[in-house]
């Protein structure tokens, strides 16, 4: 399996990845198409496509910040789930050599409990601080999520940095923008 960065929004594989994204996440957790295109212009944003035998196997939309990698969206093609693809994507992301941060729904029903166990098996730990992800789209409110990180829980300073980066950089690409314009110039991606 290969994980490659896609910068071309017209690439047929990326268009299939966007279909997977729309099928895998509820509407309130998705960017609008123009916002997705804008995010792809940001050097810190990586639309990573997992390919197996030339076909789309999954995706990881992530942000490569100086001190950590933030996995904003991760999903696997439904017919390929349970075959270790998600684990391999996470293992490849770990090659960045810095902490990896992601968010999950609170483990309150079977699917979210299974999702938390999956990430724990992959070496992630739940952080105990309260976290509300801002809305991506008009008409929605922020939603409560659990922050997980690998290889350890985040320090107070790291939590504050994540909250700031989420508000000022990641959510810049939301409609309406949830943040002010950040400075540019982060280092190259994974």
Where are these regions (language model features)?
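A short helix-loop-beta-strand connector motif used in the catalytic cores of GNAT acetyltransferases and
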Residues: 39-49, 141
